[in-house]
């Protein structure tokens, strides 16, 4: 009976350890994916700001053309 308890305890302990390792790896993978998503969103934000800057520059240039006339 004591042997069965020890064996069961060992199996449960090893199962718990393997689950915690899998959870840790899963969290690391999710963190990497989130970091990649953050980098992509930063790139999009930078692109949007450049586009807006270009649009504003074009509007400003057009308004200066009309002022000179």
From Swiss-Prot:
Cleaved signal peptide residues: 1-22
Entry keyword set: Amphibian defense peptide, Amyloid, Antibiotic, Antimicrobial, Chemotaxis, Cleavage on pair of basic residues, Immunity, Innate immunity, Membrane, Secreted, Signal, Target cell membrane, Target membrane
InterPro entries: Frog_antimicrobial_propeptide
Positions in coiled-coil regions: none
Assembly, per entry: Monomer and/or weakly self-associated, oligomer, and amyloid-like fibril. Can adopt a monomeric nonamphipathic alpha-helical conformation, possibly with the aid of its cationic N- and C-termini, when bound to anionic membranes. Forms stable and ordered beta-sheet aggregates in aqueous environment or when bound to anionic or zwitterionic phospholipid vesicles.
Region (Disordered): 25-45
Family from the record: Belongs to the frog skin active peptide (FSAP) family.
Gene Ontology biological-process annotations: chemotaxis; defense response to bacterium; innate immune response
Protein name: Atypical cationic antimicrobial peptide
Main localization category: secreted
């Amino acid at each position: 009976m004591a042997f069965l308890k020890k064996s069961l305890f060992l199996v449960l302990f090893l199962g718990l350890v393997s689950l915690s390792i899998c959870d840790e790896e899963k969290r690391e993978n999710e963190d990497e994916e989130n970091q990649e998503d953050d980098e992509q969103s930063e790139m999009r934000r930078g692109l949007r700001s450049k586009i807006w800057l270009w649009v504003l520059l074009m509007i400003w240039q057009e308004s200066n053309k009309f002022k000179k006339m």
